[in-house]
Curated annotation (Swiss-Prot):
Transmembrane segments: none annotated. This is Adenylate kinase. Residues 30-59 are annotated as: NMP. Residues 126-132 are annotated as: LID. Its EC number is 2.7.4.3. The gene is adk. It comes from Corynebacterium efficiens (strain DSM 44549 / YS-314 / AJ 12310 / JCM 11189 / NBRC 100395).
Length: 181
């Protein structure tokens, strides 16, 4: 299965992806992990991305897309993947669709983890990270809403909405049921 994971910060995407990866036998591909790996290994894409990050700029879509393309070409992703952190915009969704269509492997679905803002704030504050305060969290949620609302419309019938409140186990059971697993 080739799946994209969507959901606001604090929705539990990373937690669910780790469980789903094991249960479905497909890799969890996080763009954050890709950036860290490419920068850490000093790959040409990592060097290029680091220049933007060091300058306090967003890494351009084409650089991120090339990292994703390279990772999707690896053997363990041949039978499917869970993609987390890309796409974030309709432009990126179109780029991903082109990459997958050229490989003859279109996307199977888009899991959209839905959770209330208050639950997200509570979860993120309980993590105890220094940069997690309520104002910062609500700002991040606003950015997510602005970027992702068009993406959810764009994907239309590929969207699989999952209610992401409750225990990790309950959310995972709902996800697997929605995927027919």
């Amino acid at each position: 299965m080739r799946l994209v994971l969507l959901g606001p910060p604090g929705a539990g995407k990373g937690t669910q992806a780790a469980i789903l990866s094991e249960k479905l036998g497909i890799p969890h591909i996080s763009t954050g992990d890709l950036f860290r790996a490419n920068i850490g290994e000093g790959t040409p894409l990592g060097i290029e991305a680091k220049q933007y990050i060091d300058a306090g700029k967003l890494v351009p879509t084409d650089v991120t897309a090339r990292m994703v393309q390279s990772r999707l070409a690896e053997a363990d992703a041949a039978e499917g993947f869970l993609l987390d952190g890309f796409p974030r915009t309709v432009e990126q969704a179109d780029i991903l669709a082109d990459l997958l269509d050229k490989a003859g492997n279109p996307l199977d679905g888009v899991i959209n983890y839905q959770v209330s803002e208050d639950v997200v704030v509570e979860r993120m504050l309980s993590r105890g990270r220094a940069d997690d305060n309520e104002e910062t969290i609500r700002t991040r949620l606003g950015v997510y809403r602005d970027e992702t609302a068009p993406l959810i419309s764009h994907y239309g019938d590929k969207i699989i909405n999952i209610e992401a409140e409750g225990s990790v186990e309950d959310i995972n059971a709902r996800t697997l049921e929605a995927l027919g697993k």
